[in-house]
Amino acid sequence: MHKKYFIGTSILIAVFVVIFDQVTKYIIATTMKIGDSFEVIPHFLNITSHRNNGAAWGILSGKMTFFFIITIIILIALVYFFIKDAQYNLFMQVAISLLFAGALGNFIDRILTGEVVDFIDTNIFGYDFPIFNIADSSLTIGVILIIIALLKDTSNKKEKEVK
């Protein structure tokens, strides 16, 4: 018999990501001034202390009330989807846990300081990507995993229809 929910795994992932996110942000905020930067991998990765009071790329800068409301709605929706749509599906539960942790990590920053600490500064194929953090990475990986899970589910349904 398959497990319906992988609660322990899901909580462990979410707690690890939130703690890792918050610890790294704390280290950056307490040891570097905004704008300070150092190179980790030449021409590819820097650690740069940055603050963002908006979303990705500074979109909706200063709209904290909006972010509070939308984040609470998203967190509740993720719990709902975890319970309703991710039954027996460890892959989907991991994806939702990563999304939850990423949203919560940035939400904690917004509540405590009114802005998000960003510090991962990459240059990918000559494009200076916007500075981000562990929570943002968790959100991105979670979205990618959800897309993979949905594509796989769609593919499996088509295979069953053919048979």
Swiss-Prot record:
Membrane topology, as annotated, equals: Multi-pass membrane protein
Transmembrane stretches, by residue range? 7-25, 63-83, 90-112, 134-151
Residue intervals annotated with topology Extracellular: 26-62, 113-133
Biotech use, in short, is: LspA is an ideal target for anti-infective agents as it is required for the survival of MRSA under physiologically relevant conditions in human blood.
Task: Report which reactions are catalysed by this protein.
Answer: Release of signal peptides from bacterial membrane prolipoproteins. Hydrolyzes -Xaa-Yaa-Zaa-|-(S,diacylglyceryl)Cys-, in which Xaa is hydrophobic (preferably Leu), and Yaa (Ala or Ser) and Zaa (Gly or Ala) have small, neutral side chains
Which cell locations does it reside in?
A: Cell membrane
**Cited PROSITE patterns:** SPASE_II
Which InterPro entries does the UniProt record give?
Peptidase_A8
Q: Name one GO molecular function term.
A: aspartic-type endopeptidase activity
**Disulphide connectivity of cysteines:** none
Enumerate the Pfam families for this protein.
Answer: Peptidase_A8
User: Its domain of life?
Assistant: Bacteria
What residue ranges lie in the Cytoplasmic compartment? 1-6, 84-89, 152-163
Q: What happens when the gene is disrupted?
A: Mutant in strain LAC grows similarly to wild-type in rich laboratory media, but has a reduced ability to survive in whole human blood.
The active site consists of D118, D136
Question: So what does this one do?
Answer: This protein specifically catalyzes the removal of signal peptides from prolipoproteins.
User: Which PANTHER family does the UniProt entry name for this protein?
Assistant: LIPOPROTEIN SIGNAL PEPTIDASE
What is the recorded name of this protein?
Answer: Lipoprotein signal peptidase
User: Which source organism?
Assistant: Staphylococcus aureus (strain USA300)
